[in-house]
């Protein structure tokens, strides 16, 4: 797996100082909130992850719906080498490096490579084209994540080689479960009406809900939140 990939996913070296969404990020499918149509028991994606046979795919949806979390759950379960890049921070040289290393690794050890590219819509056409040969040949399995409509932001040739999964904003019950998970991490229990207010304010975004919770607990300074 990519070096230090899960420092973020598990709260990392910051430990209790890491932001709450990082500290409570699900590590397995049975901890994942929402998206039952995509990842529910018996779904094609659930079976593919469980059987370690994921293909190239793109997760598309609003912030806080679980795109990065799903990719990292794949990373926790796969025997493949997992590489994570942010399209905001890398370019063609980085893509070519990953493809070259993937080819060497496959030839030397037989280990396949999964490349998670966050914010894939930030790659321009030339950068996306650089990915295409590796995806087309099966040298890498691509997992892309985007908040933008991939039919407009991802090259048609690349998109045609990926399965598209659209993630929806979390419903109130799922968000309430996320908030309760945060409460456990923060060793606090909210009144139901306060939890409901956080859920309503979060707008279907799990990360937003946890950030609101963390800010509220910090502002209370150890006093009960009311």
Task: Mark where each language-model region is.
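Conserved catalytic/switch belt of AAA+ P-loop NTPases
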Residues: 46-50, 117, 121-160
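Short glycine-rich substrate-engagement loop in P-loop NTPases that contacts/grips substrate
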Residues: 38-43, 80-114, 125
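C-terminal helical "lid" of AAA+/P-loop NTPase domains
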Residues: 195-201, 207-221
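A short, basic N-terminal segment
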Residues: 1-51
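Walker A/P-loop
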Residues: 2-13, 47-85, 100-103, 132-137
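A short hydrophobic beta-strand->loop->alpha-helix junction that borders the nucleotide-binding pocket
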Residues: 61-62, 83-91, 146-147, 167
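Helix-loop-helix "sensor" segment of P-loop NTPases
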Residues: 176-195
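Conserved AAA+ ATPase "SRH/arginine-finger" region at the nucleotide-binding site
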Residues: 86-88, 163-176
């Amino acid at each position: 797996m990519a070096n230090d990939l899960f420092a973020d996913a598990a709260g990392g070296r910051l430990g209790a100082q890491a932001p709450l969404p990082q500290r409570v990020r699900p590590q397995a499918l049975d901890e994942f909130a929402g998206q039952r149509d995509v990842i529910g028991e018996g779904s094609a994606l659930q079976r593919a992850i469980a059987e370690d046979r994921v293909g190239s795919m793109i997760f598309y949806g609003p912030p806080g719906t679980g795109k990065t979390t799903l990719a990292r759950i794949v990373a926790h379960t796969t025997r493949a080498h997992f590489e994570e890049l942010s399209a905001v921070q890398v370019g063609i040289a980085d893509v070519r490096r990953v493809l070259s290393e993937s080819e060497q690794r496959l030839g030397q050890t037989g280990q396949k490579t999964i490349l998670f590219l966050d914010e894939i819509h930030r790659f321009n056409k030339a950068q996306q084209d650089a990915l295409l040969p590796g995806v087309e040949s099966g040298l890498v399995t691509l997992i892309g994540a985007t908040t933008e409509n991939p039919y407009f932001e991802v090259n048609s040739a690349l998109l045609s080689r990926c399965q598209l999964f659209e993630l929806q904003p979390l419903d109130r019950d799922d968000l309430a479960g996320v908030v309760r998970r945060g409460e456990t991490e923060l060793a606090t229990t909210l009144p139901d009406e306060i939890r409901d207010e956080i859920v309503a304010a979060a707008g279907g975004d799990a990360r937003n809900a946890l950030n609101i919770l963390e800010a509220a607990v910090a502002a209370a300074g150890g006093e009960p939140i009311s």
